[in-house]
Amino acid sequence: MAGGFVSQTPGVRNYNYKLTPKVFVTCFIGAFGGLIFGYDLGISGGVTSMEPFLEEFFPYVYKKMKSAHENEYCRFDSQLLTLFTSSLYVAALVSSLFASTITRVFGRKWSMFLGGFTFFIGSAFNGFAQNIAMLLIGRILLGFGVGFANQSVPVYLSEMAPPNLRGAFNNGFQVAIIFGIVVATIINYFTAQMKGNIGWRISLGLACVPAVMIMIGALILPDTPNSLIERGYTEEAKEMLQSIRGTNEVDEEFQDLIDASEESKQVKHPWKNIMLPRYRPQLIMTCFIPFFQQLTGINVITFYAPVLFQTLGFGSKASLLSAMVTGIIELLCTFVSVFTVDRFGRRILFLQGGIQMLVSQIAIGAMIGVKFGVAGTGNIGKSDANLIVALICIYVAGFAWSWGPLGWLVPSEISPLEIRSAAQAINVSVNMFFTFLVAQLFLTMLCHMKFGLFFFFAFFVVIMTIFIYLMLPETKNVPIEEMNRVWKAHWFWGKFIPDEAVNMGAAEMQQKSV
């Protein structure tokens, strides 16, 4: 039987709830949206290391890879090859802006469905690709799907979960992403051993499976109480809230949702309003957290792990196996965040993960520098290569329980309803833009910066860790509608939040500012 709880957080309202099967099931299915993103992250790097794929579409890179005299740092340097990976994220950036309107007007679940549908079409284009144009069209369609899913799923999970467990439930999105990566690397490992072009076609075409999963999931999922109220279905919203909280005593939380909705209706232009001073904390965080998440360098590992491991001297099969190991490590360590984020809070995980990533990145850069040198003509022995893989796993673990899940959780939970869709669109857009830059420029940066590239990312890890320490207040256990109290108490952000904002709605605040 589900136990009864009362959210207990000093200075904010307390809500009644029980851990019901319905909230577990809905959040579990909702998290499927992360699978399409994760599968693509894991599949693209493996496919770009497969010789039949390179020979078919990127013969110049294939010849460089086979050259015995090629600088190890520059073996895979090709703007066209990186465009295959990065084009998805430009499309995701654009679609996330449209997705914010669909998420608000039609509900979170239909935005998720549309994401799965466009991802499905994109997987068909890639699986049957006959030329570069078909590959890129497919990647763009995949990107539209990722943009819709990434915009709607974190918001859906945050709104369905009880405040005290919002972190754990929201981190299901990151778990799904990493699970998708692991499944993709396993598939790549086996398809890479197939003769001819069938292997990479299977890898790319199987992206249709997670797409179908999120489409079916979206059709059977209920919409969130917040979204139902926002669209005028008040009675249905209360019934849904009672259902997912497992109690009829939801009047206080329901009234807060009603108040938040009424306030949001007075805000005609959320994109304009998010620029107002009282929303400065949310604007800065939704810009800087996804920016810093990408500057951890994690997608260097996620996109190009097989390519990177081949650069380190591993064979094709061993490179894919090593990428699979790092993916499994990341999946297991993501569960650490699921079970600790609502107990220890967001800040401690951000800070600890940052320190762990910093130390491992410096060690990786130093070892590669010593072994390859600046010319990139040295050799790395098996024991040293295995040590580098171990250091990469330590780095991935630090990311997996900090910046990985929290980079999606925190931006989705800090914004009031009246700017939530715009804030999440900004979050996804910034994330996708810098994901695109990292994906497009990494192989060129590796060629020119060599082992110094790891020190480059380590520098940003220092900056982001300091930023979190100084600028992010603790948000665990705080209801979304009560978040202004947290910002008001902060040493810096408090000056942007008027005293009345803690107890007064957005509509009244807007009238006072006119």
UniProtKB/Swiss-Prot annotation:
Subcellular location, in the record's words?
A: Cell membrane
Q: Which residues lie on this side of the membrane: Cytoplasmic?
A: 1-22, 472-514
Q: Which PROSITE patterns match?
A: MFS (PS50850), SUGAR_TRANSPORT_1 (PS00216), SUGAR_TRANSPORT_2 (PS00217)
* Gene that produces this protein: STP4
So where does this one cross the membrane?
23-43, 80-100, 117-137, 140-160, 172-192, 202-222, 283-303, 321-341, 348-368, 387-407, 426-446, 451-471
Identify the InterPro entries for this entry.
MFS_dom, MFS_STP/MST-like_plant, MFS_sugar_transport-like, MFS_trans_sf, STP/PLT_plant, Sugar/inositol_transpt, Sugar_transporter_CS
Q: What would be an example GO MF term here?
A: sucrose:proton symporter activity
Family membership: Belongs to the major facilitator superfamily. Sugar transporter (TC 2.A.1.1) family.
Role of this protein: Mediates an active uptake of hexoses, probably by sugar/hydrogen symport. Can transport glucose, methylglucose, galactose, xylose and mannose, but not fructose.
Give the induction text. Induced locally by wounding, elicitors such as chitin, bacterial pathogens such as P.syringae, compatible fungal pathogens such as A.brassicicola, E.cichoracearum and F.oxysporum, and incompatible fungal pathogens such as B.graminis. Also induced by aphid feeding.
* Keywords annotated in UniProt: Cell membrane, Membrane, Sugar transport, Symport, Transmembrane, Transmembrane helix, Transport
Gene Ontology terms: cellular component? plasma membrane
Q: In which tissues is it expressed?
A: Mostly in flowers and roots, especially in anthers, including pollen, and root tips. Also present in some hydathodes.
Q: How does it sit in the membrane?
A: Multi-pass membrane protein
* One Pfam family matching this protein: Sugar_tr
Per the annotation, which location comes first and is thus the protein's main one? Answer: membrane
The protein's name is: Sugar transport protein 4
Biological process (GO) annotations held by this record are:
sucrose transport
